[in-house]
Every structure is written in structure tokens, then in C-alpha cells.
Amino acid sequence: MKYILMTLPLAAVVVASLMTAQERPNMTAAETGPARAVRVEATVKAPISEVWRVWTTSHGAEEFFAEKANIRLAIGGPYEIQFDPKDERSGTKGLKILSYAPEEMISFQWNAPPEMPEVRNGGTWVVVQMRPEGTDRTHVTVTHLGWKEGLEWDRAYVHFTRGWGDLMKRLERRFTDGPIDWNKERMMYQESRERKS
């Protein structure tokens, strides 16, 4: 993936500078106000119909996004992702689909982890856009919007700058290696946390 960086808050620049070239998603971001956004892009080796399926169905999302999902493709339908099936707080329970255009875009409400309560209930949203590149590749852009000002918002911004980049890497892996093995993913995550502490 190619790395693009426009004006980022200092904290996001620090996070981006800590990533190796391999870890960096193709990302851009606006600094403040209504235009402030986390944006990541990737081109995956899959036809648009398959990319659409993994973003808009429960089973599809469970192949790359999280271990459990509840998605019903309808305006106001659920877009619920459960990152840790044993901890109901670790997901997006109660969040809804805002809009969609088949095989072009979907937007949905989003929240932050429970340890960021101000942002968790702050009303952000995500827009996923996709376009075919030939018959066997799809370009995907994820834009996370609705950011406000404040220290907790800045922390969440840094969190999601990395998080959406990680998600796009899993999306790419889904189409090169098959559905994500969540047991293996949890072990790798735990090992990573232990190395950092």
C-alpha cells in the first residue's frame, strides 16, 4: 500500500511515524473541525460483488471485520460488530446503517471503545466507498467522520487512525489468504500487547 499523509494532528503524526512502511495504510486526514476525518484506502484482489458482500452481510463481516456481526442491509438496519464475543461492551451494539448505494457505498454510525465514553456516544459515522478496478480488483476507501475537539477525541482519533489501517490490512488478507482465523488473530493481538508492556 502507498502512504499518503496530509495535515494530521500531532498525535496522529506520531502514530504514523511509528508504523513501518509495511504497516502504513494509504491514509489522509483533515486536521480539525467538520472536515477532520480518518481516511484509509486499499485496492483488494477481489471483484466488487465480493467486497460489497463482506461489508454488507453478517457472514461477510465475520470473515475480516470481527468475530461476530449483525448486519441487515437497510436504511436504519443494524450495523453491529462484536470485537470480543465475551464482552458485549466491545462492539457497536445498537448502531445503524445510514445510507447505501449497492456496490458503491455504505455509511453507518460508529462509536469508540468503552474506555472513551465521551467519544463512544459522540455520534461519529463511517463511509465505505468502493469502485471496481477491472474485473478482479476493487478500490476501497474508508472515511471516519464526525470528530469533535478535546483530549479524549484526539486519543480516539489516534486510535482509529491505526485501527482502520489494521482493518484494511485484514480486508486485503481476507482476499489473499481466506477468511480471518479469529483464534489466531486473538493470539497475535495478545502477544503484541504483551511485547508492548
What are these regions (language model features)?
Residues 116-162:
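Beta-strand/loop substructures that line and gate deep hydrophobic ligand-binding cavities in soluble
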Residues 1-4:
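Positively charged n-region of N-terminal signal peptides that target proteins for export
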Residues 8, 21-23, 146-197:
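A conserved amphipathic terminal alpha-helix motif
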Residues 18-70, 196-197:
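Hydrophobic ligand-binding cavity/cleft-lining segments
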Residues 7-17:
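Bacterial N-terminal signal peptides
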Residues 40-42, 68, 93-99, 123-132:
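Hydrophobic/aromatic beta-strand elements that line small-molecule binding cavities or substrate pockets
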Residues 45-49, 98-105, 129-139, 165:
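A short, structured loop/turn motif at beta-sheet edges
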Residues 59-94, 103-105, 184-186, 190-193:
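Short beta-edge strand/loop motif at the mouth of beta-sheet-based domains
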